[in-house]
Amino acid sequence: MTQTPPARRMRLGIAPALEEGGMKGKTPRFKDIQAMAQAAERAGFDSLWLEDHLLFRFPNQPEQGCWEGFTFLSAVAAVTTRIALGSFVAATSFRNPALLAKMAESLDEISDGRFILGLGAGWHEPEYTAFGYLFDHRAARFEEALQIIVPLLREGQVDFAGQYYSARECVLRPRGPSQGQLPIWIGASKPRMLRLVERYADAWNTVWHRQPQGVRDVMPEFLAACQEVGRDPASIELTAGSFAEIVLPGEQRKPDAKGIGGQAEEVAAGLRGFADVGVRHLVLLVEPEDITGIERFARVIELLDEMEASAGQQPG
């Protein structure tokens, strides 16, 4: 039976790769993602996240195709029972906003209320060009998309006509178990996007940081945006993405390793630093990149829970 993890100051998520070569140089198949999701449940992870990319094409590098994330999330929802599932993050420009809200509501139903909708404006222009999407005015398009997606998910209806998108007398029916409370994360770093976080999001995804200090460094802009919009920063959950590599005694870290790494005790101590700077949900790219990394990480989760329990017992 899957064990429900204890209440945590900072929840932990894992983000398996969907791109070619993303699993120790191999292309992940659905059976691999399914096995990793089920292993993550057993290990005590709180959430599992899948990316929303179509194609990676960088200069002087082999191009990498990606599986479609929402299709995989639907399948993962059917073979898991406890772990939360999310998009990290869905590019609103890849889909009609009203349809994206419908997809999120459907995933809410399939997962029995475990889905989290992570949203972003997209960034990798080559995949836009390859698949025929417009790359211009991404922030403006994103803002209009939110004006459709958020009312649909919250109130179940919207009537909107903008420069880029419209949804006239649109209703979202039937409704899933979250009943208008499906969590919405927004990934953002620039001032204009941060203002959209304050207006529409339940959680701010501060994107990727190798160390906790990276989160601390971006907080002033976040607080300024909150003040400008008039929202209490405490009402927005702080989330981040990072990297963790777990090695066994006698093993060495990869030469190009980034983020926090070492044996389980070192990784646990390093990750705890994210909780100390206010992160309440940390999404990780874990090395090794297959089920081995998840199984090794189970010990890290045990250590983090022990640290939290010990801290809670200390006087004062």
Model-inferred region functions:
Residues 1-79, 182, 285-290, 294, ...:
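N-terminal beta1-alpha1-beta2 module of alpha/beta enzyme domains
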Residues 145-150, 213-223, 290-311:
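C-terminal helical cap(s) of enzyme catalytic domains, especially alpha/beta-barrels
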Residues 16-31, 90-98, 179-189, 252-265:
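Active-site mouth loops of central-metabolism enzymes
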Residues 12-16, 48-50, 84-87, 115-119, ...:
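Hydrophobic faces of well-ordered beta-strands that scaffold small-molecule active sites
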Residues 41, 108, 272-276:
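Non-catalytic positions within long, well-ordered alpha-helices that form the structural scaffold/packing
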Residues 42-45, 112, 201, 279:
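A structural motif
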Residues 2-10, 56, 60-62, 87, ...:
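Internal, glycine-rich beta/alpha segment that forms the wall or movable "lid"
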Residues 17-19, 53, 90-92, 120-122, ...:
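Active-site beta-loop-alpha junctions enriched in small/polar residues
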